């Protein structure tokens, strides 16, 4: 299988619960290498730009408000079939449908405050990584 990169966000509600280390441990236990990470507090402009595909949808303003309500942790994960494996670890977007043992089952508070984000395709991952990480900020660790 090919090595892929995927993009992950630990959202404000999960950061506030002080579970960053627990989530990182689960990434590593699942076989991912964390090849880039940083904590930041999104501006409204950054959040609107990142979620631009949802502009005009009924939940958009609430999503932007939530994502700017506190710090987030953005990360680049590397591994075999990383996009799908990461999504499996996250669980269903709606935590009510998330299987036990997934990150959203464990850390989500609601559909909007679902604790985590993960890229839905290799193409989305590349776009999302480039949105938050510049040249030289992602360090390959595959060996």
From Swiss-Prot:
User: Which class of enzymes does this protein belong to?
Assistant: transferase
Name the domain of life: Bacteria
- Modification comment: Phosphorylated, probably on Ser residues; monomer and dimer are both phosphorylated.
Q: Which Pfam families does this one have?
A: NDK
Q: Which UniProt keywords apply?
A: ATP-binding, Cytoplasm, Kinase, Magnesium, Metal-binding, Nucleotide metabolism, Nucleotide-binding, Phosphoprotein, Transferase
Question: Where does it mainly reside?
Answer: cytoplasm
Enzyme Commission number(s): 2.7.4.6
The reply on keyword DNA-binding is no
List the InterPro entries: NDK-like_dom (IPR034907), NDK-like_dom_sf (IPR036850), Nucleoside_diP_kinase (IPR001564), Nucleoside_diP_kinase_AS (IPR023005)
Assembly description: Homotetramer. Monomers and dimers have both been detected.
* Name assigned to this protein: Nucleoside diphosphate kinase
What's the source species for this entry? Escherichia coli O127:H6 (strain E2348/69 / EPEC)
Which gene produces this protein?
ndk
């Amino acid at each position: 299988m090919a090595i892929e990169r995927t993009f992950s966000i630990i959202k404000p509600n999960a950061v506030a619960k002080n579970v960053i280390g627990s989530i990182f441990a689960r990434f590593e236990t699942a076989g991912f290498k964390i090849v880039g990470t940083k904590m930041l507090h999104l501006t409204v402009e950054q959040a609107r730009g990142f979620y631009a595909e949802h502009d005009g949808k009924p939940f958009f303003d609430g999503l932007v408000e939530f994502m700017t309500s506190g710090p987030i942790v953005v990360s680049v994960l590397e591994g075999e079939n990383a996009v799908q494996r990461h999504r499996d670890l996250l669980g269903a977007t709606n935590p009510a449908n998330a299987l036990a043992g997934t990150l959203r089952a464990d850390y989500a508070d609601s559909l909007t405050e679902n604790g985590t984000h993960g890229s839905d395709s290799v193409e989305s991952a590349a776009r999302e990584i480039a949105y938050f990480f510049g040249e030289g900020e992602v360090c390959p660790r595959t060996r």
